[in-house]
Amino acid sequence: MPTRRGSCVLHLLSSQEPDFLSAHQEALRFLQDLVRIDTSSPPGNETEAARYIQGVLAYEGIESQIYEREPGRGNLVARLEGNGSKRPILLMGHLDVVGVEPDAWTEEPFGAVIKDGYLYGRGSQDDKGMVAVALEVFLMLHRSGMELDRDVILMAEAGEEGSPQLGVQYMIDEHFPEIDAEFALNEGGSIIQQNDRWVVSVATTEKVSRRCASSPTAPQATGRGHCRTIPSYTWPLPWPSSVVGNTP
């Protein structure tokens, strides 16, 4: 089952135009609530976050199941049924987060404080933001009442941060029919980031013909000369090197 990484916009074809502003505000509330649930891995505690989502879905009349390989490491799965003319699509994201060093934070890492237009909190991007958006899209589809050509599956998984045997691998091994889909929409994409460039030292061994270093027949006739021919490479940017204007 391939995973398509990146952003996805679902165009909802219904008789009533979706209220995207309300959807944004609701998704933001979901995100804040999820961030405030400490799911640092280890120990994880994803089941508490899964139960929160289960409560949201139950309020809308949507059934869901939580699957655990170990106590507290829950994976939530819910499904909207389509007419079956196409294979399902899977909306997914993970509930666990990397541990924090509180002293390194300017805001409480599980406070989900919004300040100057930014939400501060562990997991706000990786990956509870994705979970909140997937949940909102799932609810919008349900509320629209539109006929779906395919089932839409929502999975909020455990164990992505180093313990896939408790999350997606467990679901594949033990409950694959529940998540079997034509493709999945997961986290990822070309996000502008800092501090992702590293210095790497590389040692190589060059095999060349024996020559006297004082009279090589070509620049690459000696190992040192050969190494000098290794070109440097700069990756071209597919976008302008400067950003002009404001982004929403």
Which ranges hold each PLM region?
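Acidic/His- and Gly-rich active-site-bordering loop/insert found
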Residues: 12-124, 141-150
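Extracytoplasmic/secreted envelope proteins and their assembly/folding machinery
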Residues: 28-31, 47-50, 54, 131, ...
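Short, solvent-exposed loop/turn segments at the edges of secondary structure
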Residues: 73, 86, 107, 149, ...
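Acidic/histidine-rich catalytic neighborhood of metal-dependent amide-processing enzymes
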Residues: 119, 125-202
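Acidic-enriched catalytic cores of C-N bond-cleaving enzymes acting on peptides and small amides
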Residues: 176, 190-196, 203-205, 209, ...
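Flexible glycine/proline-enriched surface loops and loop-helix/loop-strand junctions
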Residues: 196-198, 215-222
